[in-house]
């Protein structure tokens, strides 16, 4: 537990201290945000707000993770694992793709960065590399970071994917989550606050998997997850980094995370869900992100087939703004929905364990 607390504390401290330094640096360099011309009128006042704040989030996560393991040397904590590094590596590569996207937007003074093809190639490359490596690194107990079995709370043995299909599955999961968080990052603090809650839920889930691992506590309801404690540390560091960033990103935002942060955070959800064997449960925990990306897909499909729009504007948080809701009202209500979804997800996880032990 102390490793988790250290991860939160270090990540939060680094993020909350580094973010204002980035605000000053990006302001001097003119790295300002460019709003959508067709966006809500209230958003035009945000033009010029520093972007690429995701750098602070990624730095905070890495600092929390590495700092925890350095501190662990003093009290014989578990070392760095393949699962933890794979998740962080995936998030970092996606963060680099997002950084390039943000940089092009700034250089060209418009709200369009990398073209869709280049951005998709970056996401797919990161996902393929993650998927291939996740089925390797078998430990002494025969466990790999990921399982080819489709997973809800634990593997569904009746649905086993061939290696090639598993990699394709990872491409879908990574692309979906990175885009979902990216679309959600349209209001001050919405994505950061929601991510803090989702990763906090994952701290509870992965720590419970650690306490009930089949390797150390064999029996009914145990979990065959390779590195659950290290995943809990990654989740804790992410939650801490998001909270630290939220201090400056809360409305009215002093800085935005940009695609640098949103793509990286989407990678965190994708990576942890795959390595903790909870890909389906993640949809419940991250219901807000799922709803946001679904609203975009629905809007596009409906408009192309009928010429009409379902929402005033997509992602659908803008729909509520255009309906007259204040931005802060949308944010707080969406946070509440995320909290409910996370509570439901943790309850489903625990309920499955109770069922597994016959309670």
Curated annotation (Swiss-Prot):
Q: Which GO terms describe its molecular function?
A: metal ion binding; phospho-N-acetylmuramoyl-pentapeptide-transferase activity; UDP-N-acetylmuramoyl-L-alanyl-D-glutamyl-meso-2,6-diaminopimelyl-D-alanyl-D-alanine:undecaprenyl-phosphate transferase activity
Essential cofactor(s): Mg(2+)
- The primary site where this protein sits is membrane
Name the pathway it acts in: Cell wall biogenesis; peptidoglycan biosynthesis
Give the GO terms filed under biological process for this record: cell division; cell wall organization; peptidoglycan biosynthetic process; regulation of cell shape
* Entry's Gene Ontology cellular component terms: plasma membrane
Record's CDD domains?
Answer: GT_MraY (cd06852)
What are the EC numbers?
2.7.8.13
The source's superkingdom equals Bacteria
Where would you find the membrane-spanning parts of this chain? Answer: 3-23, 55-75, 80-100, 117-137, 156-176, 187-207, 231-251, 255-275, 280-300, 334-354
Checking Pfam families in the record gives: Glycos_transf_4 (PF00953), MraY_sig1 (PF10555)
Record flagged with keyword Cytoplasm? no
Tell me the protein family, please: Belongs to the glycosyltransferase 4 family. MraY subfamily.
Name of the protein in its database record: Phospho-N-acetylmuramoyl-pentapeptide-transferase
Could you tell me which species this protein originates from? Answer: Mycolicibacterium paratuberculosis (strain ATCC BAA-968 / K-10)
Question: What does the record give as the organism's lineage?
Answer: Bacteria, Bacillati, Actinomycetota, Actinomycetes, Mycobacteriales
- The coding gene here is mraY
